[in-house]
Amino acid sequence: MNIAKMIDHTLLKPNATKSEIEKLCNEAKEYGFASVCINPCFVDLAYSMLKDTDVKVCTVIGFPLGANTIETKVFEAVEAVKKGATEVDMVLNISMLKSGDYDYVKKEIEEVVKAVKSYGDIVVKVILETCYLTVEEKVKACQLTKEAGADFVKTSTGFGPGGATVEDVKLMRQAVGENFGVKASGGVRTAEDAKAMIEAGANRIGASAGVKIVEEWNKLKMS
């Protein structure tokens, strides 16, 4: 297993600098990560550094609260794709989900999916922010995401009070079935963490500690 190809090399902190993003992109090229996951203002910079490589540019939409209007999320996603992003991680509207307005939640995801996929094979990951949800809400969010035509469910923003757990990843994998993406993010900091998430059903890992994870993985010769 090539662990690097399962990692979105991530830097989303609010005080990230251009030079830190450049370092992130260089590390992604060196280690062969699946993507870099960065804030929207850095998409053009990341694209300029990675356009001739296999590393994808991933950005976040409606981040980190998920509380923007549908129109705003669509605009943000389309703008990112026009600047070179080929993966978008959108935060679903947590308030609407918890209010039981499932039509809104599904429509929002559908609108973003439809808008970005008109530009090509863009991967859409939907962040559930599992730390705020009941088991029933997590399952419902997974079902809505799948029905709406997205490609992945993702656990967390990393900005909430809790990140990915093995239990949540197992539940999400069970809810979406085999042929769908599950991304574990938030608090995945070691090779052991990554292995636990993959064994639970994740096929993508979001982590700012990607380099450390790969180096530990190779040293321990995990499979």
Curated annotation (Swiss-Prot):
Supply the source organism's classification: Bacteria, Bacillati, Bacillota, Clostridia, Thermoanaerobacterales
Compartments where found: Cytoplasm
Protein family: Belongs to the DeoC/FbaB aldolase family. DeoC type 1 subfamily.
Name the coiled-coil region(s): none
What Pfam families does the record point to? DeoC
Q: What does this protein do?
A: Catalyzes a reversible aldol reaction between acetaldehyde and D-glyceraldehyde 3-phosphate to generate 2-deoxy-D-ribose 5-phosphate.
Judging by the UniProt lineage, the source's domain of life is Bacteria
Respond yes or no to whether keyword Cytoplasm is given for this record. Answer: yes
EC numbers, comma separated: 4.1.2.4
Query: What is the name of this protein?
Result: Deoxyribose-phosphate aldolase
Pathway-wise, it operates in: Carbohydrate degradation; 2-deoxy-D-ribose 1-phosphate degradation; D-glyceraldehyde 3-phosphate and acetaldehyde from 2-deoxy-alpha-D-ribose 1-phosphate: step 2/2
Which Gene3D superfamilies does this UniProt record tie to the protein?
Aldolase class I
UniProt KW keywords:
Cytoplasm, Lyase, Schiff base
Q: Tell me the InterPro entries matching this sequence.
A: Aldolase_TIM, DeoC, DeoC/FbaB/LacD_aldolase, DeoC_typeI
Source organism per entry reads: Thermoanaerobacter sp. (strain X514)
Name any Gene Ontology BP term: deoxyribonucleotide catabolic process
Instruction: Give an example GO cellular component term for this record.
Output: cytoplasm
